[in-house]
């Protein structure tokens, strides 16, 4: 009996060991973690781009947060379009701006997709804090560009004194040839809503050249809805510790590109006092203002920029304007104080 019991015990132990071994063979083993595809810096298109994981597309996200207090006659009306509802001569508002730029190399050149939007708040009301604006949205391949974007008329002088254009943003198709120091381009703009007429387009053309520290832009635009046009020249030159600029515009009659006067000339000088401080005085004169003979307007002012710290800057603008349209004369001071955090 003792012999049989030992035999049974030994057999049971062998069986248990076999079952245990079989269970161990069938056990689930955790897989080794796959290496993470960390975000990589993309330096092919400038600072701030990174590769979208798993692609060869580079993405940049940037923007700013701004607080500004503006002052001038009926400033609230001008900014918000409230008409008789508001008569304050000062206005505080805040803005958030964010932009996304996606770029990749192709056999046809650099492919870009760009989107930017503004979120504005003038006060705590359903009207004032819901001012969302699509700033730009376009596709660009090499020199070809299509979408909603700022035209070449949007370029102005340094400072805050000049006003050298009328409407500057359109749904457009444009092509810009860039040959080093020389550029030439043409654009077709949709004008729907710009006038009371229909089915018209705007055509722009630009030629630019840079020689040393001097650059020259020659720009023209023709509005087919009103059959009028405008031409503009703008010169920038590095001069001493700053940049001198001068520009002139002539228009055949009011049109989508320029509608303030028959002719105008403006100038400014940005003086870089230190690495943080820049001072920009400016002058602007409009002849035949409002396309009325012998009517004129002039403006003189100063803009001061100060870099408080990395990513945080301020700007103060003070402008004096004098307008003379026959018996209608007006003199006023306007400007703003701005604080902006860029990222």
Curated annotation (Swiss-Prot):
Example of a GO cellular component annotation carried by this entry: pore complex
Subcellular location: Cell outer membrane
Primary localization: membrane
GO BP of this protein: monoatomic ion transport
Leader sequence segment: 1-17
InterPro entries named in the record: Porin_alphabac
Keyword line: Cell outer membrane, Ion transport, Membrane, Plasmid, Porin, Signal, Transmembrane, Transmembrane beta strand, Transport
A Gene Ontology molecular function term of the record: porin activity
Keyword presence, Ion transport: yes
Membrane disposition: Peripheral membrane protein
Similarity comment text for this entry: Belongs to the alphaproteobacteria porin family.
Function: May act as an outer membrane pore.
Protein name: Putative outer membrane protein y4fJ
Biological source species: Sinorhizobium fredii (strain NBRC 101917 / NGR234)
């Amino acid at each position: 009996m003792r012999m049989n019991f030992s035999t049974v015990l030994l057999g049971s132990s062998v069986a248990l060991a076999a079952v245990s071994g079989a269970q161990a063979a069938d056990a689930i083993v955790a897989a080794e973690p796959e290496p993470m595809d960390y975000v990589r810096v993309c330096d092919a298109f400038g600072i701030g781009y990174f590769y979208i994981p798993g692609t060869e597309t580079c993405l940049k996200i940037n923007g700013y947060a701004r607080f500004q207090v503006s002052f001038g006659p009926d400033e609230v009306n001008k900014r918000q379009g409230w008409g008789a509802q508001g008569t304050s001569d000062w206005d505080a508002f805040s803005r958030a701006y964010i932009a996304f730029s996606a770029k990749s190399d192709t056999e046809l050149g650099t492919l870009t997709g760009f989107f930017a939007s503004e979120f504005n708040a003038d006060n705590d009301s359903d009207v004032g804090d819901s001012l969302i604006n699509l700033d730009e949205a376009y596709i660009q391949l090499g020199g070809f560009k299509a979408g909603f974007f700022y035209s070449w008329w949007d370029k102005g002088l340094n400072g805050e004194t000049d006003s050298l254009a009328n409407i500057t943003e359109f749904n457009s198709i444009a092509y810009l040839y860039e040959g080093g120091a020389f550029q030439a381009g043409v654009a077709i703009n949709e004008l729907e809503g710009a006038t009371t007429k229909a089915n018209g387009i705007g055509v722009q053309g630009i030629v630019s050249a840079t020689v040393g520290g001097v650059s020259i832009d020659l720009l023209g635009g023709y509005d087919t809805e009103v059959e009028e046009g405008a031409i503009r020249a703008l010169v920038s030159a590095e001069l001493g510790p700053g940049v001198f600029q001068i520009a002139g515009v002539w228009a055949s009659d009011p049109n989508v590109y320029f509608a303030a006067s028959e002719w105008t000339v403006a100038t400014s000088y940005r003086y870089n006092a230190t690495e943080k401080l820049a001072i920009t005085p400016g002058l602007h004169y409009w002849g035949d203002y409002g396309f009325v003979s012998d009517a004129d307007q002039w403006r003189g002012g100063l803009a001061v920029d100060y870099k408080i710290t990395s990513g945080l800057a301020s700007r103060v603008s003070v402008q004096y304007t004098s307008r003379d349209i026959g018996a209608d004369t007006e003199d006023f001071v306007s400007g703003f104080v701005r604080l902006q955090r860029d990222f």
